[in-house]
């Protein structure tokens, strides 16, 4: 997969302020505030920055954590996992494999079949109908 590389100024001009803060500066939207937290429509969730397909809506579940949660990415190659020791915690950050956008974190407390919970910021994703 060909990487997309832009300067922070280029990303800032493409994204709204909240998208920029979360995707490019590794921020976090407030829990229960994101437009996809309670979303139930079918489709594919794509990276808001580069359009890469990230999650199938059929893998979304209600974790009660305040952010959209998925038990698996659409392809393992769509994500990069990075050890995150910020805020006095040890977590695993997930970023878009194509543009390095911060998406959220993955935790080992999800449902079968993976046992994983990809906790994703709504501002980082875009739900599109299936082709």
Swiss-Prot record:
Cofactor note: Binds 1 zinc ion per subunit. The zinc ion is important for the structural integrity of the protein.
This enzyme's EC code(s): 1.8.4.12
Keyword Oxidoreductase appears in the UniProt entry: yes
Signal peptide: none
Cofactor: Zn(2+)
Entry keyword Oxidoreductase: yes
Catalytic activity field: L-methionyl-[protein] + [thioredoxin]-disulfide + H2O = L-methionyl-(R)-S-oxide-[protein] + [thioredoxin]-dithiol
GO cellular component terms listed in the entry, alphabetical order: cytoplasm
Catalytic residues identified in the record: 119
A GO MF term: zinc ion binding
GO terms of biological process kind: protein repair; response to oxidative stress
Binding positions for Zn(2+) per the UniProt entry: 47, 50, 96, 99
Keywords: Metal-binding, Oxidoreductase, Zinc
Family: Belongs to the MsrB Met sulfoxide reductase family.
NCBIfam families in the cross-refs: peptide-methionine (R)-S-oxide reductase MsrB (TIGR00357)
Protein name in UniProt: Peptide methionine sulfoxide reductase MsrB
Species this chain originates from: Pseudomonas putida (strain ATCC 700007 / DSM 6899 / JCM 31910 / BCRC 17059 / LMG 24140 / F1)
Gene coding for it: msrB
């Amino acid at each position: 997969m060909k990487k997309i590389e832009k300067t922070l100024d280029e990303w800032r001009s493409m994204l709204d302020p909240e998208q920029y803060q979360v995707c490019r500066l590794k921020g976090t939207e407030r829990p229960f505030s994101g437009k996809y937290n309670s979303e139930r429509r079918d489709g594919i969730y794509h990276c808001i920055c580069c359009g890469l397909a990230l999650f199938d809506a059929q893998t979304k579940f209600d974790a009660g954590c305040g952010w959209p949660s998925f038990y698996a990415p659409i392809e393992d190659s769509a994500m990069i996992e990075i050890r995150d020791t910020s805020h006095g915690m040890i977590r695993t950050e997930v970023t878009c494999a194509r543009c390095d956008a911060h998406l959220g974190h993955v935790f080992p407390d999800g449902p079968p079949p993976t046992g994983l919970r990809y906790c994703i910021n709504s501002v980082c994703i875009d739900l599109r109908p299936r082709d």
